[in-house]
Every structure is written in structure tokens, then in C-alpha cells.
């Protein structure tokens, strides 16, 4: 199943112009799956980067505007879109001019593939 998911995510990576990395981690930032283009985007793998998203989501939820599902940010010359799919965090890293709407549209396309990973993480 892991190869199917990886192949599917790699296909999505090719569909969105300027998208460099799709990474799935658990809530603590432990990488579970990663697909990337040739361009090296190391900052997305930094151990503190993903848990910072989790903390930011928790804090944003306290604003009284409802549950936070997505955070879009800029880092250097990169655009980072992180989605809260508890117990998973889905991270997309693209060029600063990458179409954010295209990245956000991928959310519903990957939901079906995430179910098996969610179940494995929950059982572990």
C-alpha cells in the first residue's frame, strides 16, 4: 500500500507547477512518507518545523474562530502549506509563486489515501 500512496503523491507533485515536496508526518513531526522533486528543500525536514505547526494550530484554535485546519506561510523563497489531518500533518512545500489554490485543492484528493496511514498511526 505504501508504494501505491507514494506513486499517487508523486503524480500529484507533477500536476502542480512549482510544488517541490509533499510530506506526511505524525503530530510530533516524525516523517512517515515523503515525495519530492530534484530540488533540495531540507528545511521541511527539520525536526522543529512540523511540531511548530501543531503548536500554531492549537493556539489559533483558541482565538474563538473554530478549529484550525490549514496554515499557509512563507519561508525564505518557499511557500509552505500545512494541513491538520489528525493524527497526521500533511505538508506541501512549493515555490513562492506556486498556485496556493491548486495546493489547497489537493486536500480532498488525498483524503482517501490517508485513511490507511491514519489507522496505522492510531494503532501504533
Swiss-Prot record:
Which InterPro entries is this protein grouped with? LAMTOR3
- Domain of life according to the entry: Eukaryota
User: What biological-process GO terms show up in the record?
Assistant: cellular response to amino acid stimulus; positive regulation of TOR signaling; positive regulation of TORC1 signaling; protein localization
Organism of derivation: Drosophila melanogaster
Q: How does it assemble?
A: Part of the Ragulator complex composed of Lamtor3, Lamtor2, CG14184, CG14812, and Lamtor4.
Function according to Swiss-Prot or TrEMBL: Regulator of the TOR pathway, a signaling cascade that promotes cell growth in response to growth factors, energy levels, and amino acids. As part of the Ragulator complex, may activate the TOR signaling cascade in response to amino acids.
One GO CC annotation, please?
Answer: Ragulator complex
Q: Which family does it belong to?
A: Belongs to the LAMTOR3 family.
Instruction: Please give the coiled-coil regions recorded for this protein.
Output: none
Q: What is this protein called?
A: Ragulator complex protein LAMTOR3 homolog
Amino acid at each position: 500500500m505504501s508504494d501505491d500512496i507514494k506513486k499517487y503523491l508523486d503524480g500529484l507533485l507533477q500536476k502542480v507547477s512549482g510544488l517541490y515536496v509533499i510530506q506526511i508526518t505524525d503530530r510530533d513531526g516524525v516523517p512517515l512518507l515523503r515525495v519530492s522533486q530534484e530540488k533540495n528543500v531540507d528545511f521541511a525536514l527539520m525536526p522543529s518545523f512540523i511540531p511548530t505547526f501543531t503548536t500554531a494550530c492549537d493556539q489559533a484554535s483558541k482565538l474563538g474562530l473554530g478549529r484550525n485546519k490549514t496554515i499557509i506561510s512563507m519561508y525564505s523563497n518557499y511557500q509552505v502549506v500545512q494541513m491538520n489531518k489528525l493524527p497526521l500533518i500533511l505538508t506541501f512545500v512549493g515555490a513562492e509563486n506556486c498556485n496556493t489554490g491548486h495546493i489547497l485543492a489537493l486536500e480532498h484528493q488525498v483524503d482517501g489515501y490517508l485513511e490507511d496511514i491514519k489507522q496505522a498511526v492510531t494503532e501504533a
